[in-house]
A protein has these predicted regions:
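Alpha/beta-hydrolase fold catalytic core
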Residues: 1-25, 46-49, 87-88, 115, ...
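Conserved alpha/beta-hydrolase catalytic His-Asp/Glu region
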Residues: 128-129, 133-134, 152-215
């Protein structure tokens, strides 16, 4: 496994883990998360793919410029990465906000260069509309109730001034059974994204509505969610229902089915994704 750097046209540089041979698979972690958190999955999937796990701008080992913290810019970063590495066709896997980056990429650049998609636990639309029914709120995975909730979460990110406060912030994304001794590593990786930049990106992503993009996806797709996630399992089933022949896998709450099921039940997660990619 090696770490490579990709120089972007706006002057920033992205860092990525690279390993394996075969068709390229680009992995895009979620908000404040890093490629290092995916090492176990990277190693597993490298048996059948040339895996490139990105640190988005500001995240992990990537450069941290003071500009560009919008989902649209992250989609451009993904596009430039594919172009600069001269990858003719790629599989894409995103987690959380990483899915939104993929949806923005599809919206801007289409699907012709994408082989297969793995979409891991992101809501189609996190911010509600007043006229939506309770079923629609569940189907679209509305995480926020109002703009005040966005402000509160952004303030929570800004309040993460050290490792202890960051541990408290990330704890809510896991099931109660998740080993306490593993949280410091997750928090350390999370904290690599400067908090003022993290809050800026969080605010931009909060109001995205990706339903019309999802409904146009024609790539072979696996959707993964968790019963104990911050996003409803109904929202993951809705995504799968909108994409022809998409597969869906919902992890039960007692089997690590949190927003981070790929950490809590890595063996099952890796096995399911490998099975999908092989077929």
């Amino acid at each position: 496994m090696e770490r490579i750097s990709v120089q972007l046209d706006d002057g920033a540089a992205l860092s990525a883990l690279k390993v394996g041979e075969g068709r390229p698979l680009i992995m895009i972690p979620g908000w404040s998360q890093t490629s290092a958190e995916w090492k176990g999955t990277v190693e597993s999937l490298s048996a059948i793919r040339s895996v490139l796990a990105l640190d988005m701008r500001g995240h992990g080992e990537s450069e941290k410029p003071e500009y560009g913290y919008r989902v649209s810019r992250l989609a451009q970063d993904l596009h430039e990465t594919i172009q600069k590495l001269r990858l003719p066709k790629v599989d894409l896997m995103g987690h959380s906000m990483g899915c939104a980056v993929i949806w923005a990429y599809i919206d801007l650049y289409g699907q012709d260069h994408i082989g297969q998609l793995v979409l891991v636990d992101q809501a189609p639309c996190m911010f509600p509309r007043a006229e939506w029914s309770s079923q629609e709120l569940a189907d679209f995975g509305c995480f926020y109730g109002s703009s005040a909730d966005v402000d509160e979460l952004a303030a929570g990110a800004l309040a993460c001034v050290d490792l202890d406060s960051t541990i408290e912030f990330v704890r809510g994304f896991f099931t109660p059974d998740f080993p306490e001794e593993t949280l410091p590593f997750i928090a350390e990786e999370n904290f690599k994204f400067p908090r003022h930049l993290a809050a800026k990106l969080l605010r931009d992503a909060a109001f995205g509505d990706w339903r019309d993009v999802i409904q146009r996806i024609r790539c072979r797709t696996l959707v993964v969610g968790g019963e104990a996630s911050i996003f409803t399992s109904a929202s993951q089933r809705w995504i799968a229902s909108q994409i022809p022949n998409a597969e869906v896998e919902i992890f039960p709450a007692n089997e690590g089915g949190s927003h981070f099921m790929f950490v809590e039940n890595q063996t099952r997660f890796n096995s399911r994704v490998l099975s999908f990619l092989k077929s």
